[in-house]
Amino acid sequence: MSEIRLYVTTTESKAEEILDLLSAVFGEEDFAIGTTEIDEKEDIWEASIYMMAEDEAEVHSRVEDALKASFPNARLEREVIPDVDWVVKSLEGLKPVRAGRFLVHGSHDRDKVRPGDIAIEIDAGQAFGTGHHGTTAGCLEAIDAVVRSRPVRNALDLGTGSGVLAIAVRKLKNIPVLATDIDPIATRVAAENVRRNGIASGIVTRTAPGFHSTAFSEHGPFDLIIANILARPLIRMAPKLATHLAPGGSVILSGILATQRWKVIAAYSGARLRHVRTIWRNGWVTIHFDRP
């Protein structure tokens, strides 16, 4: 069944207001809600809510009612998102990736695992994160370093995608991990990958559209938070993210172009975190902070 996106095109400030409105209307219901920048120069943004086709009629009606009350001039638009399993045909071209002690590989490369490898099996699919992108590999390297160097008892993988980073933490250390994403398809894919890697009992996967989700208060605070998203949302969420970090905890951030690193470092320094290390990979950076 196809997924449906309902969205409003507007400015950044109004998109954030609509995001807050929809989050209040739908609360803990299993619908992904988010904002996306379309054109930075022209200040064009979209506020979106995602649902399966069977839920569209009810969700559409509730969204329209909410918008009429607060944003009477907003135009609600619709997009059908095809249920496509991408890159599967190119699996043979995806080679295993090494990062720290980890080897991320597809099911077709199980024979490449060597003694001593911490193997994570992830096939290309509908969610980001097979280890081939510099941001994922940088996060894996940082996770390995953090878990080696300090106690970690409770972890959060924010924007989990394929679940590869949550799986990495759990395979390194027998601790609880919360893996969240705004996209229910990504959450489902992550749960499937967790089961594939034989560690389903240690990782909780949740669809959570923002920090107002009760998932974070139920499972936190966390002494390791990993967020491989994009620089702009990482900068915006710095104050809220920091409130979920336990004393002495670590934060690993990626999805950041090298040219954007100073803005991210400034935002998290402003949230009273200390910049520890920056890992560079193919024009992208992964940044490690801790709470002194």
Swiss-Prot record:
Binding site for S-adenosyl-L-methionine: T136, G159, D181, N228
Catalyzed chemical reaction(s): L-lysyl-[protein] + 3 S-adenosyl-L-methionine = N(6),N(6),N(6)-trimethyl-L-lysyl-[protein] + 3 S-adenosyl-L-homocysteine + 3 H(+)
Superkingdom of the source species: Bacteria
EC number: 2.1.1.-
PANTHER family with a match to the protein in the record: ELECTRON TRANSFER FLAVOPROTEIN BETA SUBUNIT LYSINE METHYLTRANSFERASE
Keywords: Cytoplasm, Methyltransferase, S-adenosyl-L-methionine, Transferase
Principal localisation: cytoplasm
Subcellular location: Cytoplasm
Its biological purpose: Methylates ribosomal protein L11.
GO molecular function: protein-lysine N-methyltransferase activity
Coiled-coil segments: none
Pfam families from the UniProt entry: PrmA
A GO CC annotation given for this chain: cytoplasm
Source organism: Rhizobium leguminosarum bv. trifolii (strain WSM2304)
Protein's UniProt name: Ribosomal protein L11 methyltransferase
